[in-house]
Amino acid sequence: MSGFDDPGIFYSDSFGGDPGAEEGQARKSQLQRRFKEFLRQYRVGTDRTGFTFKYRDELKRHYNLGEYWIEVEMEDLASFDEELADHLHKQPAEHLQLLEEAAKEVADEVTRPRPAGDELLQDIQVMLKSDASPSSIRILKSDMMSHLVKIPGIIISASAVRAKATRISIQCRSCHNTLTNIAMRPGLEGYALPRKCNMDQAGRPKCPLDPYFIMPDKCKCVDFQTLKLQELPDAVPHGEMPRHMQLYCDRYLCDKVVPGNRVTIMGIYSIKKFGLNPSKGRDRVGVGIRSSYIRVLGIQVDTDGSGRSFAGSVSPQEEEEFRRLAALPNIYELISKSISPSIFGGMDMKKAIACLLFGGSRKRLPDGLTRRGDINLLMLGDPGTAKSQLLKFVEKCSPIGVYTSGKGSSAAGLTASVIRDPSSRNFIMEGGAMVLADGGVVCIDEFDKMREDDRVAIHEAMEQQTISIAKAGITTTLNSRCSVLAAANSVFGRWDETKGEDNIDFMPTILSRFDMIFIVKDEHNEERDMMLAKHVMTLHVSALTQTQAVEGEIDLAKMKKFIAYCRARCGPRLSAEAAEKLKNRYIIMRSGARQHERDSDRRSSIPITVRQLEAIVRIAEALSKMKLQPFATEADVEEALRLFQVSTLDAALSGNLSGVEGFTTQEDQEMLSRIEKQLKRRFAIGSQVSEHSIVQDFTKQKYPEHAIRKVLQLMLRRGEIQHRMQRKVLYRLK
C-alpha cells in the first residue's frame, strides 16, 4: 500500500484527441443524455400492478434524506440500453463521470422546489451492483486494466478515513497568479503542478521554476479510505500464498466494512505509480512499472457471521433435496458416518464434530448481551489417533474453515495485529485467523504446544466471541463468531493412566470454555486392532479406484452446502418439554443423586456448572438444526446429555480433569488444601528449600506424589513460590 500519494502521475483524456474537441464534447453530451434518459424513464412493474420509476423515486427519497448517492444495477442498464452498459463496462472511469452528472441533473429536476438555504445542488455518487459471476484476484491481468471487475474476498485491514482533493486552487509564490477549480482525477492518481508560471510577461521579473503551491483552504475535498482485500481461502491453490489487492473507496463507500468481513466488490481495475523511495539510495528505475489497485464502485457484504454467503447460491432443486435429506429418520447417523469416513471408529467423537459443524442458535438478550451458539470441542490423547485428520476434514467441510497449528500461531496471528501503514505512516489493524473465520470453524492443531500467553489471547474469542484491541491508539472490537476445534497430546506424549490429571497441562479457565472434551486413548484390543488393520489395508488397496462416495454417506460438496443451508435457514430453540427435562436432569446432576452415583460408580460431588448446562443446550439445538426443526425435542436433549456424558463427564469422573473448574472431587480438594496448609507452615516467606526434600517429606506422610506436585504447581501459577538454581530449589515469595 506504499506510494499511493506520489504526485508524479500524468494522464490523458481517452475521449478522442483534444479534450476540448467538438466531436469528443458532442459524444459526451449524447452519452450523458442517454444516461439521464435511463435514470428518468427506467421503470419496474407490470400493467396490472402498476409501474414505478425505480431510480427517479430512489433519487428523490435519498436526496430528501440528505443521502446523496444511488445504487444502479448493471442488469437494469443492460435491459434498457445494452450499448450503454457495454460502454460503462469497458470504459468505466469516463462513463461513470457522465452517469454521475446525469444523476445530478435528474436529482435537480425531481427535488424542485428546494427549501430556502438549500438551493445549492449536491453531487450524487453512483454505486454499481451486478449479479454477474465474480472473478478471482489471480485472473486480473493487463488486458483487464481500466475495465469494470467484480472480485470476492476478505477485508484484512482498513485505513482511517482521510480527505482527498477533487478540485484544487494553486497560486504562484512570485507573482501571486492564481489558478482555481482545477479538476483532479478520482482514485489514487496525483496531480503534477505546472513547472512554469503562465503569467510571464515582458518587463516583469521572471518567475522561478516550480513556483506554484496548493491553497488548502480553497480546495474541495471528499472522504476516502484504503482497504486491503485478500482472496478467499478456498480459492487459494494448495501450497500457495493468498494474493492481496489494494482498494480505494471514497464518499459514502467509506466505513462500510471492517476487517474480517467477506465482501464482493465492483470496481475499476486501475494503476498507480510504483513509488520507489529515492531516500533509500535506489535509482528511480522502471519508468513504465505501475502497481495496481481497484477503485471501488460498489460493495456487497456477503455474510453476517453465520455462513450465509454460501446459502444464497442454493437452487430450488437443491433446497428440495436438502429438505428431503433433513426429513430422513437416520440423518444424524448419516452425517456422522460422512465425517471423515476414511477414519475407523470414534463414532461419538464424529457425532460431536457433526454438532460443532451445525452449531446451536445465537441469542440476543433483552439487555443487549449475546449468548454464543457456536460449540467448542477439544480432543486430548495419544498420537496416531487421527486427531489431525479430523481437523483437516472439518476445515474442508465447514463453509468457512481456517486451519492453524499451535506452534506456528502467535496471539496476534490468531486474534488481530496493529501494523504501520507504509504510505501514510498511520497505524492500521489486520485481522487474524479467528477474525477471518467469522461464521465458521477455527481448527487449532498441537494446542498443547502453544505458549501460555498466546493461549490466553483466545479466551475472550471463545466465550464472548469478540476480540477487543487496545494498541497504538486503536481501541476497537472485532467479531469472531466461530467454533474452535482443538487437538492436543498429553504432557507425557502418550496417555499415562497412573498420572491421572497430570496428563493435562491446561489452565482451568481455557478447559471450561470447551463444551466437550474427549480423551482419545490408543487402547490395545486384539479384536479392535484386527478391524482397524483390515480397514487401513482396504483404504490403501482401493484408494486409486474409489472416486465416488460410498453408499450411505454424503459427499463432501453436498455436505458443505447442506451445513451452510441449515446454519442460514434454521435457528431452533428448546421446546418446553425438553427444557423441563434438562432442568430436572441438571438438578439431579448438581445434587449428586442416585442416578449420578450409578453413572460414576462412586460418590462424587462433581457439580455441572452453568457454562456446561449452556453447552448441553447448544448441542441439543445443533441436533435439531440437522433435521431443520424449529424446536429441540426431548430426544435431542437425551442425545446431548449422552454426548456430554461420554466426553467431559467421563473424563472428569475418571480424575483426568481434576483441578479443572468444577471438576475436582471433594476428598481430593480437601487433601490438596491439607497439603497446602502444612507446606505453608513449614516453608516461611523469604526462605528457600529443595523441591526434592519437600516431595520426600510429604511422601513419608502417605500423601500421593502427584497431589504434592499439583499443590506446588498451583502455588507456582499463583506466584507464591518460584524456581531457582536450575529448578532445583523453591523460593517462597508470599
Curated annotation (Swiss-Prot):
InterPro entries hit by this protein: MCM, MCM5, MCM5_C, MCM_CS, MCM_dom, MCM_lid, MCM_N, MCM_OB
Keyword Cell cycle: yes
Catalytic activity: ATP + H2O = ADP + phosphate + H(+)
Enzyme Commission (EC) number: 3.6.4.12
The keyword Hydrolase is annotated on this UniProt entry: yes
Signal peptide limits: none
GO biological process, one term: premeiotic DNA replication
Pfam families: MCM, MCM5_C, MCM_lid, MCM_N, MCM_OB
Domain MCM residue range list: 331-537
Modified residues (N-acetylserine): S2
Cellular component GO terms held in the UniProt record: CMG complex; cytosol; MCM complex; nucleus
Subcellular localization(s) per the UniProt record: Nucleus; Chromosome; Cytoplasm, Cytosol
Annotated ADP binding sites: R371
Entry-annotated residues carrying N6-acetyllysine: K392, K396
SUPFAM superfamilies assigned to the protein according to its UniProt record, in alphabetical order: Nucleic acid-binding proteins, P-loop containing nucleoside triphosphate hydrolases
Molecular-function GO terms, alphabetical: ATP binding; ATP hydrolysis activity; DNA replication origin binding; helicase activity
SMART domains: MCM
Motif (Arginine finger): 512-515
Keywords, sorted A to Z: Acetylation, ATP-binding, Cell cycle, Chromosome, Cytoplasm, DNA replication, DNA-binding, Helicase, Hydrolase, Nucleotide-binding, Nucleus, Phosphoprotein
Assembly: Component of the MCM2-7 complex. The complex forms a toroidal hexameric ring with the proposed subunit order MCM2-MCM6-MCM4-MCM7-MCM3-MCM5. Component of the CMG helicase complex, a hexameric ring of related MCM2-7 subunits stabilized by CDC45 and the tetrameric GINS complex. Interacts with ANKRD17. Interacts with MCMBP. Interacts with TONSL; the interaction is direct.
Role description: Acts as a component of the MCM2-7 complex (MCM complex) which is the replicative helicase essential for 'once per cell cycle' DNA replication initiation and elongation in eukaryotic cells. Core component of CDC45-MCM-GINS (CMG) helicase, the molecular machine that unwinds template DNA during replication, and around which the replisome is built.
Record protein name field: DNA replication licensing factor MCM5
Species this protein is from: Mus musculus
Lineage: Eukaryota, Metazoa, Chordata, Craniata, Vertebrata
Gene name in the database record: Mcm5
